[in-house]
């Protein structure tokens, strides 16, 4: 896994190679101009914009935005091609997270994609939770396999037979492994790019400890990393909390999660999960160790994962009627430089200035590109890069060349500013930081505006119909949660618990559960979800 400094050096090297190629192109342009050749026709193509607005048809809007540069639909339903624009976002998050877990002494590994039925079915509660989603290989050529082989929906049962082999004594602990891989969950209802797909990329960490205290500590450390991915990189506000018994990981002791919320649809999204598995899997797979007193004990285990769902949440949160809006930290192109030639102005000088500007930014560690395509108008390029979501646009025209300045245009709010070339790098860095922070603050304000505190069933139903993120006092009983699901089941989906936030508001004595009328034990977020 390359570290950020290596990535920076790679970008600079690629930029220098690109500059050399662009010089050849410019020489051809200059030669054509001086020889009096007819200027190439500039395309004024239409159809760049989206056909629907985000607040009018969210589902169609989301599909159109994803299809621009993020994914391509595949000929198998629920499977998608991740194009370079989205894959780069995944790689940037991967670099951050991989470096952080290595600080925690987690090591990367890789386990096979295939699972034998005997192993998969060993942990009854676990497999019952995943059974409807498991895909099976049943043939080899035209012959039926004697024993069908499952494709991993998650890797607990794949990995843990070998944990029992590798762990013998207390000196073998903790064992901390992570793998970056794909998994398959054969979703049959409403596949959605990034959010619900049959195959997706993720990381899954699996750790074993001598004590529950160590496991508990790691659960929260990992959850904090997931919060940072969403809030610091994707500029998406999330709530950290505990899942209910009904919603926790099948076979686990407890599940923590970061939960996002999409105001346009009024739905929550489980952003990432960090589970304490307790000793249940250790019992099933006989993962024991000899402690310092020569006594045999079972290990305590965790598992934790985040996936390419993160990208879908980012698109839903920040995208607008022009297309994507990318936070600078995860944008593969943070700045695009566009020439704006005018009539008989010094076109070659403008092109040279664009190349020099992009190169200066790249040298400073900013991911920048110049768009020197001469068969598209500046206006067409503006729309194209706006749709791609590039955080900052720099325009250079004759007046900018004359005044030794550039014009910047922010993607998040459209604000334009003329800045001197002498302070270009410092100013652009500052702007990118402001864009990142503003995107987070705007998203947080929108989410907070959707939070509705309720105390009665009637208030709950009203808030649910108004697409609110509902915070309600709850008795913390599984049967009551199941009853809420049953009573709210409809065309838009049943309401359920999202999480009980770690940051609990005060619960006055005598507060009753909104659904059962029994004494409330905690505040819990409720809503419909993806």
UniProtKB/Swiss-Prot annotation:
Its main location: cytoplasm. GO terms for molecular function: ATP binding; proline-tRNA ligase activity. Catalyzes the attachment of proline to tRNA(Pro) in a two-step reaction: proline is first activated by ATP to form Pro-AMP and then transferred to the acceptor end of tRNA(Pro). This is Proline--tRNA ligase, cytoplasmic. Belongs to the class-II aminoacyl-tRNA synthetase family. It catalyses: tRNA(Pro) + L-proline + ATP = L-prolyl-tRNA(Pro) + AMP + diphosphate. It is found in: Cytoplasm, Cytosol. Coiled coil: none annotated. InterPro entries: aa-tRNA-synt_IIb, aa-tRNA-synth_II, aa-tRNA-synth_II/BPL/LPL, Anticodon-bd, Anticodon-bd_dom_sf, Pro-tRNA-ligase_IIa, Pro-tRNA-ligase_IIa_arc-type, Pro-tRNA_ligase_II_C. GO terms for cellular component: cytosol; plasmodesma. Its EC number is 6.1.1.15. Keywords: Aminoacyl-tRNA synthetase, ATP-binding, Cytoplasm, Ligase, Nucleotide-binding, Protein biosynthesis. GO terms for biological process: prolyl-tRNA aminoacylation.
